[in-house]
Design a protein with these regions (language model features):
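Small/polar/charged residue-enriched interaction surfaces, especially the RNA/DNA-contacting tracks
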Residues: 1-332
């Protein structure tokens, strides 16, 4: 079933810098600043952007902390092995992938994965979420100065003064610059939608920083879900289902993957989902045929209620999370 398309969610996220931002290139420069922002060719020119991989990494790292704050040892440390997770043993469980067999079927991998691996993926499983690169709007460079030069110095740990020959310089993206990214969920459970909304809410509250120098005041951003675009892009959160399925999702309900699987006769234990994976909406949101999909758009009050209900589902899911069966055969 995970190789079929059951349900989808997509949204456009505007990310505005509330201070200087530096997502470094990761390689040394022969000329110019010691630290420079990553660049790409877009809008017909070289310009700064935020890689989708950087955003996805920040999102995952943040939600791992949130999950394990609600209930310790629910989210795994994806970089640890089962035998070397000593430092995080009290809070994180070992990496999910470290215990999977090479030929393990997808449904078993999904069922045995922790919440963050189910959404973001692992070396054994691709995950449910896609985060695109965040780009500047067209003609952004013509409207304002986007890059500023800064100087920095290293501090001598003994004297507290300036370290000799330790001056460095950096180029940062200026405050008030807006980047836009698209986020796409497919075959999601309701609590996974809530997990995404928790991340977006914390970005709206300016609690998540991006890039380098976060402890030195860099990387503060604020995010918001884009409303209706001037073009064909639908605003708010767009949820859709595939019209080919014989099951019909009522206009006053939102079905997650578990409910769709149950309606197709799949055993709950196969994927570790629940047949009760659905929301009863406070008001009907109509399905509108669009190609092979039935589309629903959540905006304004309907979006606020969707956030509230799905976040509540996320919290309950984590509080009730039980460990997956122990897997003893290591990946070959």
């Amino acid at each position: 079933m995970l190789k079929a398309l059951v349900n989808e969610a997509r949204l456009r996220l505007d990310i505005t810098t509330k201070g200087p931002l530096l997502v470094k290139t990761g390689y040394a420069t022969v000329i110019g600043a010691d630290m420079a922002p990553v660049m790409t060719y877009h809008n017909g020119q070289q310009e700064v952007y935020i890689p989708g991989s950087s955003l996805k990494g920040v999102f995952r790292s943040h939600i791992e902390k949130v999950v394990n704050s609600i209930k310790p040892r629910v989210a795994c440390n994806p970089l640890s092995e089962r035998e070397d997770a000593r430092d995080d043993r009290h809070l994180y469980r070992p990496s999910c992938s470290s215990g999977f067999k090479k030929d393990m079927p997808t449904q078993a991998v999904y069922a045995a994965s922790c919440p963050t691996c189910r959404l973001f993926g692992s070396t054994s499983y691709i995950g449910r979420i896609v985060v695109e690169d965040a780009y500047l709007p067209a003609k952004a460079y013509e409207e304002k100065k986007l890059i500023e030069h800064r100087d920095g110095i290293a501090i001598d740990r003994l004297t507290g003064g300036t370290g000799g020959g330790a001056k460095f310089d950096l180029e940062v993206v200026t405050e008030g610059t807006t980047f836009t990214t698209d986020i796409h969920l497919r075959n999601f459970e309701i609590w996974q939608l809530g997990m995404l909304f928790v991340i977006i809410q914390d970005m709206q509250d300016e609690l998540i920083r991006i890039g380098s120098g976060r402890s030195r005041g860099l990387g503060k951003v604020k995010a918001s879900i884009r409303g209706q675009d001037e073009g064909s892009q639908q605003g708010g959160v767009v949820l859709s289902t595939t019209r080919a399925y014989k099951s019909k999702e009522p206009d006053k309900e939102l079905w997650g993957l578990g409910r769709w699987l149950a309606d197709e006769g799949e055993d709950e234990k196969t994927y570790g989902t629940r047949r009760t994976d659905l929301l009863t909406l406070p008001q009907e949101v109509a399905h509108v045929p669009s190609g092979i999909r039935n589309v629903r758009v959540f905006n304004g009050e309907t979006l606020d209620k969707l956030k509230e209900q799905s976040i509540e589902s996320f919290v309950i899911q984590i509080e009730q999370w039980t460990d997956a069966p122990q897997i003893t055969t290591q990946r070959r």
